[in-house]
């Protein structure tokens, strides 16, 4: 159970990081 939870947490963190980077790139392109 702990390993599955940590795996999901890792996936979520990676998703959030990619989303923030993507939004940052979009803002830079818009400006």
Curated annotation (Swiss-Prot):
Main location as per UniProt: plastid
Bilayer topology term: Single-pass membrane protein
Disulfide bonds: none
One Pfam short name: PetL
Cellular component, GO annotation: chloroplast thylakoid membrane; cytochrome b6f complex
GO molecular function, one term: electron transporter, transferring electrons within cytochrome b6/f complex of photosystem II activity
Segments traversing the membrane: 4-24
InterPro entries with a match to the protein in the record: Cyt_b6/f_cplx_su6 (IPR007802)
Any single biological process term in GO: photosynthesis
Annotated keywords: Chloroplast, Electron transport, Membrane, Photosynthesis, Plastid, Thylakoid, Transmembrane, Transmembrane helix, Transport
Subcellular location: Plastid, Chloroplast thylakoid membrane
Function recorded in the entry: Component of the cytochrome b6-f complex, which mediates electron transfer between photosystem II (PSII) and photosystem I (PSI), cyclic electron flow around PSI, and state transitions. PetL is important for photoautotrophic growth as well as for electron transfer efficiency and stability of the cytochrome b6-f complex.
Listed HAMAP family: Cytb6_f_PetL
Binding partners and assembly: The 4 large subunits of the cytochrome b6-f complex are cytochrome b6, subunit IV (17 kDa polypeptide, PetD), cytochrome f and the Rieske protein, while the 4 small subunits are PetG, PetL, PetM and PetN. The complex functions as a dimer.
Family to which the UniProt record says this protein belongs: Belongs to the PetL family.
UniProt name for this protein: Cytochrome b6-f complex subunit 6
């Amino acid at each position: 159970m702990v390993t599955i939870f940590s795996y999901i947490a890792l996936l979520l963190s990676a998703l959030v990081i990619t989303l923030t980077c993507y939004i940052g790139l979009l803002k830079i392109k818009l400006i």
